[in-house]
């Protein structure tokens, strides 16, 4: 379940949005959970709205002026409307003064109050993007997520197949590590899965015989990535005896794996002695990039083969006719 607390929102956006607690002596926290928001008719964040309330209400100078001109009865009615909504936080933007009625309201209702000198539109725009990422549908998968040639590639396979060793080889060739063992995937768009690493495992790669390796320390800052959109799955499959010959040499259809209702291209690479898996992964990524541009090597070969066959057939027909 994806969730974010108001305290976390405050801490992770404090510097860029110049946030301050409106009531520093009585900081109150609340949780925003994606299943509650999905089952609600309220918008996530927006300017102060009493008719269609938001989970996070943002007050600018215009909103404060509106509240100041209300009489006591009308103001109480409006605040009661807020109290009945699923209000998670109030943010007073534009460096506007916090009305005393709002201070009293948040203390009575135990609602977090934040103030900022940043423009309200800037706050809404940035927090919409932040909350969309934090509250996106999420799932964890076992594998290694890498940035290979600018593309997010997740290497999967059963335990002991050599995922970490392959990842280490790719990192040594200049590619980047995103996550090892546990990959957190968030659906941040209709067709986009973003992968990242849990904080506990960030920068680390476990390799049998070597233990835990700090990739950032060993290879430098450019060898790790904070997050990456996953576009390709490379599945490593062990081969037994001569079973490598059983794999299709010219696959006519592309494989896809559905994760969080998003289709991700999948390539299966047989693991056998003597195969350079790092080169194969790089080739798979380059080939997929070409396919995204409309260039399919397999289909091109098939068309060339069919054209050659058609030419030979026509030539054979002409020879038979002349005889």
From Swiss-Prot:
Recorded GO molecular functions are: ATP binding; magnesium ion binding; phosphorelay sensor kinase activity; protein serine/threonine kinase activity; protein serine/threonine/tyrosine kinase activity
Family named by the database record: Belongs to the HPrK/P family.
What would be the name of the gene that encodes this protein?
A: hprK
Report residue spans for region: Important for the catalytic mechanism of dephosphorylation: 270-275
Its name, as the record gives it, is: HPr kinase/phosphorylase
List residues binding Mg(2+).
164, 206
Pfam family membership, one: Hpr_kinase_C
**Which keywords does this Swiss-Prot/TrEMBL entry list?**
ATP-binding, Kinase, Magnesium, Metal-binding, Multifunctional enzyme, Nucleotide-binding, Serine/threonine-protein kinase, Transferase
Query: Could you give the domain comment from the record?
Result: The Walker A ATP-binding motif also binds Pi and PPi.
């Amino acid at each position: 379940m994806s969730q974010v607390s108001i305290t976390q929102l405050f801490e992770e956006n404090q510097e860029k949005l110049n946030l301050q607690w409106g009531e520093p002596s009585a900081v109150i926290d609340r949780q925003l959970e994606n299943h509650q928001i999905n089952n609600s008719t309220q918008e996530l964040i927006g300017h102060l709205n009493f008719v269609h309330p938001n989970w996070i209400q943002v007050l600018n100078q215009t909103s404060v002026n509106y509240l100041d001109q209300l009489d006591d009865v009308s103001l109480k009615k409006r605040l009661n409307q807020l109290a009945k909504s699923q209000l998670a936080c109030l943010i007073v933007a534009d460096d506007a003064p916090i009305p005393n009625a709002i201070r009293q309201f948040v203390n009575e209702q135990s609602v977090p109050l934040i103030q900022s000198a940043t423009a309200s539109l800037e706050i809404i725009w940035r927090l919409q993007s932040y909350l969309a990422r934090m509250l996106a549908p999420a799932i964890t998968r076992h594998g290694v997520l890498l940035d290979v040639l600018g593309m997010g590639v997740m290497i999967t396979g059963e335990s002991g197949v050599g995922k970490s060793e392959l990842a280490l080889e790719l990192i040594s060739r200049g590619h980047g590590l995103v996550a090892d063992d546990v990959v957190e995937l968030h659906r941040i768009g209709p067709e986009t899965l973003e992968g990242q690493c849990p904080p506990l495992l960030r920068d680390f790669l476990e390799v049998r015989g070597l233990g835990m390796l700090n990739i950032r320390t060993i290879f430098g800052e450019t060898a790790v990535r904070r997050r990456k959109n996953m576009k390709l799955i490379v599945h490593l499959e062990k081969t037994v005896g001569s079973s490598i010959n059983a794999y299709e040499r010219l696959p006519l259809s592309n494989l896809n794996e559905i994760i969080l209702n998003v289709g991700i291209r999948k390539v299966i690479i047989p693991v056998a002695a003597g195969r350079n898996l790092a080169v194969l992964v790089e080739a798979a990524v380059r080939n997929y990039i070409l396919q995204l541009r409309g260039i399919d090597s397999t289909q091109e070969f098939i068309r060339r083969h069919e054209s050659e066959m058609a030419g030979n057939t026509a030539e054979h027909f002409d020879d038979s006719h002349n005889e």
